[in-house]
A protein has these predicted regions:
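General marker for long, soluble alpha-helical cores
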Residues: 1-291
């Protein structure tokens, strides 16, 4: 079968279907002796001149028709096409290309996934951040966890679009500082401010597993918001009984109501302490008189 392209440049111009930029790409294809099949893929007026350029460059880089057809699709813009073409030129497998050759990824996201492939990340690692809901900055935080040797379980704790890149970094920093999964989980909470996350992380890094942290983990395990769990943990550390605090936690009181109740419980403790102190002081005074 004759696969020669028979149209002349004059024929193409006379058709009047193409812009000057598109014509320039078609003319380059003709001058480079593209086959009929290659030219038929290239000379599509629905492609912009920039998209045609990516198709042309694919053929000039030695890609086959089947390879170029992976990205010669109107669902991709020229920048997305460029990222896919780069992967093909670098001999990525079909499986690797399929991870990011999706229109829902913008060119920057495609670049980060392609860059991961070029740095020999495996499919499981790539899937940790190959999500169009992640920004480039979030992807970089996940890549850093991979680079630093965190386990998949550790990375999965923060590889979630609900965390912004700064919150992700706080969780990552905890693991890099040697904190365990159990120590990091209490502050891996997207509802916490960056300041709250940082305060918790730096506190536990400095003080370790003290009584306050144990109480905090107790109430975070009940899925209480960090601010609420913190109030109860401080109350427990001050001496209020866990039975009373557990009761308050179960009732879902507002923070204002909880603070009101805890204030009264604190006053009761203070009153009892004073009574015990006076009683002890009076007893000592009586003992001294007997002498």
């Amino acid at each position: 079968m004759d696969n020669r392209y028979e149209k002349t440049i004059e024929n193409i111009i006379d058709e009047g279907k193409f812009t000057h930029g598109q014509l320039a790409e078609i003319i380059i294809g003709i001058k480079n002796n593209f086959s009929k099949e290659q030219m038929e893929l290239l000379e599509n007026p629905e492609f912009t001149s920039g998209e045609m350029e990516q198709i042309r460059l694919g053929f000039q880089n030695g890609l086959t028709i089947n390879q170029v057809e992976i990205y010669a699709d109107r669902k991709f813009n020229q920048h997305q096409m460029w990222e896919i073409r780069e992967g093909l030129i670098n001999n990525f497998s079909e499986e690797q290309i399929s991870i990011y050759a999706k229109p829902e990824f913008d060119p920057v996201q495609m670049f980060e996934i392609r860059n991961g492939i070029q740095h020999k990340l495996n499919t499981e690692q790539l899937q940790l951040y190959a999500n169009p809901k992640f920004t480039r900055e979030q992807m970089l935080e996940i890549q850093e966890g991979i680079k630093q040797g965190l386990s998949v379980q550790q990375i999965q704790l923060y590889a979630d679009p609900k965390f912004d890149e700064h919150q992700m970094n706080e969780i990552l920093s905890g693991f890099l500082a040697g904190l365990t999964m159990e120590q990091v989980q209490p502050y891996a909470d997207a509802s916490m401010s960056l300041y709250e996350m940082n305060s918790y992380r730096t506190y536990i890094e400095k003080n370790g597993e003290n009584e306050y942290i144990q109480f905090l983990k107790r109430y975070r395990a009940l899925d209480l918001p960090m601010k609420y769990a913190n109030i109860l943990a401080q109350a427990a550390e001050s001496g209020i009984s866990l039975n009373k605090l557990d009761y308050i936690a179960e009732k879902n009181f507002s923070i204002e109501q909880t603070k009101f109740l805890l204030d009264h419980l604190q006053k009761d403790i203070a009153t009892k302490t004073n009574e015990e102190t006076h009683k002890y002081a009076g007893k000592n005074k009586g003992d001294m008189k007997d002498r």
